[in-house]
Amino acid sequence: MEQRLAEFRAARKRAGLAAQPPAASQGAQTPGEKAEAAATLKAAPGWLKRFLVWKPRPASARAQPGLVQEAAQPQGSTSETPWNTAIPLPSCWDQSFLTNITFLKVLLWLVLLGLFVELEFGLAYFVLSLFYWMYVGTRGPEEKKEGEKSAYSVFNPGCEAIQGTLTAEQLERELQLRPLAGR
């Protein structure tokens, strides 16, 4: 497993070196700055590295956005998953922190919350925005994507009846045979 990981990282590094601009632009940094930048990147967690490192896409990738990078497949693996699956190159927009739409939505919500707090309507804005996000977060069954698993089928793979739960028929029978409330 670690050998395959090392091969994948080597292939990724080769692809990254091929996509780098000429060394003339990197010569402007002093060796101390390069060492400090490398130490910062090594110490940063994975999600932070994506935002600290920004590499422009090579001209060939801009001309053909459908280009994909293929990882090397180990020769000795027959029953394991193949490593020759296509991995799309990340676009420069994917790496930009400011174009993350979720971040912008949260930032807008915080700014509006601050405004309404100053106007002394902060609690009303907070409660109304909670109802709005609950509405947005729920969706009807017609919006389900083709082939998407339901939560029930994820936790109960065969969709078998669970002992102690009511079936739809049992529930209907219980509701119809029950006397009306208050009579």
From Swiss-Prot:
Residues 16-36 have a biased composition (Low complexity). One of its GO terms (molecular function) is UFM1-modified protein reader activity. Signal peptide: none annotated. It is found in: Endoplasmic reticulum membrane; Cytoplasmic vesicle membrane. Residues 1-105, 127-183 are cytoplasmic. InterPro entries: SAYSD1, SAYSvFN_dom. Residues 11-36 are annotated as: Disordered. Residues 106-126 dip into the membrane without crossing it. Keywords: Cytoplasmic vesicle, Endoplasmic reticulum, Membrane. GO terms for biological process: protein quality control for misfolded or incompletely synthesized proteins; rescue of stalled ribosome. Residues 91-105 are annotated as: Middle helical (MH). One of its GO terms (cellular component) is endoplasmic reticulum membrane. The keyword Chaperone does not apply. It holds the Pfam family SAYSvFN. It comes from the Eukaryota. Disulfide bonds: none annotated. Its main location: endoplasmic reticulum. Associates (via N-terminus) with ribosomes. Belongs to the SAYSD1 family. The middle helical (MH) region recognizes and binds ufmylated ribosomes. Ufmylation 'reader' component of a translocation-associated quality control pathway, a mechanism that takes place when a ribosome has stalled during translation, and which is required to degrade clogged substrates. Specifically recognizes and binds ufmylated ribosomes when a ribosome has stalled, promoting the transport of stalled nascent chain via the TRAPP complex to lysosomes for degradation. This is SAYSvFN domain-containing protein 1. It comes from Homo sapiens (Human).
